[in-house]
Amino acid sequence: MVKCYVKDYPRTQFVRKNWENLNGTWDFAFDDKNCGEKERWYEGFKGNLTIQVPFTYETKMSGIQDEGRHDNIWYRRQIQVDAEKLKKNNYVIHFEGSDFVTKVWVNGQYAGSHRGGYARFEFDISALLKDGENELVVKVEDSFDMQQPRGKQRWIDKNFGCWYVQTTGIWKTVWSEYVPKVNLKAVKMTPNMEEHALELEYEVEAPETLMGEELLVSASVSFKGVPVSRVITAVTSGHVEARADVFLRHNDYGLEWGVRSWSPEEPDLYDVEFQVICRGEVVDEVGSYFAMREIRIDGPNILLNGRPLYQRLILDQGYWKDSHLTPPSEEALIEDIDKIHALGYNGLRKHQKTEDERFLYWCDVKGMLVWSEVAAAYQYTDYAVQEFTREWMEIVKQNYNHPCIITWTPFNESWGVSHIETRKQEQHFTEAIYYLTKSIDKYRPVIVNDGWEHTVSDIITLHDYEEVGEILKNRYIDCKDQILTTEVYHSNHKSAMANGYQYKGQPIIISEYGGIAFNNDDSGWGYGNKVNTKEEFVKRFDEITTGVKEIPYVCGFCYTQVSDVQQEINGLMDMERNFKVDPEVIREINERKVGYWRSFM
């Protein structure tokens, strides 16, 4: 745990003390005729329902549990504001996630809007407030539009395949904070292992008249309470850069000299405290943390801190029975991470979802590797390109500082780019996203289209749900060259590379396999033939997992999946997070060193 940790604080790497959680009971109304704006509901509406924010109306935990489609919904609550605090501070309201178009009014006056369901956004509503009680009204517009990023949300009136009940409206924490008028707006932290330093990029909000020697930003770095360094930087513009030393020299504290690096085995984290100093007075303070770790590609290998990394991943869709995409509590997030570790995995693919940032915090703390994805659209149009690009860039910037994230994965299985194998326009789109991602983060690998039909990609990932281990293994040993040159389809009708692209020696990971259907519900589904006993399950799991690990050039795998999700019954746990088989048995199979992994031991 790090110094700045506050339970339930949503923005875990940028922590201020003066905040308020606005989750809880809100007035609520369906607007199925979409007449609310015309009738000025933002000035007050007759809500005959209440809802428990941040749970969506489709869920049991919302208190409503209506899985029907309602494209326009309204929320209302009162907020208390101290006018005295507003003299030196701005009042900012944050939405961690609200799907899809969110409009906000304060005391009947329009505050702003945001498009996109998965990225954090905020509004400074200071100018609209009065002392004491204020009314906050929110309208959210959603749809079954296949052009908007929707991930695993269905776009018809019933569940099908691996698509589930839609998520409409506010589904993550809503909160507020008083922010000093001169403040640290954001900080980008990049570890530099070679120089034993942390590269810092500050965004500072202040009048231009204060820029210069009278305005400073201080960063104080410590490790387990031991001071490491302090760097003070003059703010000469809204964007300034600095470098902080992270080399431990305090052997009298019982700590070894050197740089403490982050890995799944030893997830060491440094604390850092930021201060904005104006004319000698501290006007803003932010708590944070960071890690020193390097992820890079070296030919067919993925290196973490200079050492080959074998990834034992599991697909994690982040759904819960009674709350769907919204975690029921912070403890539920911790439980998932601990149980994934108990199963012998060192990482996960957070699939088609931008998870609550508290989850990333606990992955940082507990040493869980994360592949970061984004919700897919399912139709290729100019509008879809625009919506996807904007939201993906917001997400990459939002989560850049988390050391647990080692890979960006913007596309999955050609969803939203269904003709990518042959259409240049769709290929160019994925290339553009690759290079845009690299323009923000030049260090992490980018997997442009996970599973098949790769264009430009730092890692080649393949999906294969073959249920016979020997067939799975021999396919990739006997036909490696033919698969990578697309002479042979590795997954029925899918090729590894899109037309016009060649394999260039990148690392290869089997990033989806397994998906064994196993529970007592005959109506559910998984991949391949369902198993009926624990013994059958373990036998197949062992055979296919061992088969994947015995492919000598494959440097990792990702099993489908953590838990059952609604009609999909192929989890290692059910939706209540009960293990289906003894986790120690699964752990032993996962941690057995064979093939590529054994060659580096």
Describe each model-derived feature in a short phrase.
Residues V106, A197-T236, A244:
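Beta-strand-rich binding/interaction modules
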Residues V187-K188, E273-I340, P445-I447, G500, ...:
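N-terminal carbohydrate-binding accessory modules
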Residues D8-Q13, D27-D32, Q65-L184, T209, ...:
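Accessory beta-strand-rich segments of carbohydrate-active enzymes
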Residues K85-N89, L129-E133, M146-Q147, M211-G212, ...:
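Short glycine/proline/serine/threonine-rich loop/turn segments at secondary-structure transition edges
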Residues E135-V138, E266-C278:
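Short, aromatic- and glycine-rich surface loops/edge beta-strands on solvent-exposed regions
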Residues Y178-T209, K593-M601:
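Surface beta-strand/loop "capping" patches
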Residues I337, G347-N578, V585-N590, W597-S599:
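Substrate-binding/catalytic cleft of secreted carbohydrate-active enzymes
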Residues M1-G63, K139, S143-Q148, S220-S222, ...:
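Accessory carbohydrate-binding/adhesion or oligomerization-edge regions at the termini
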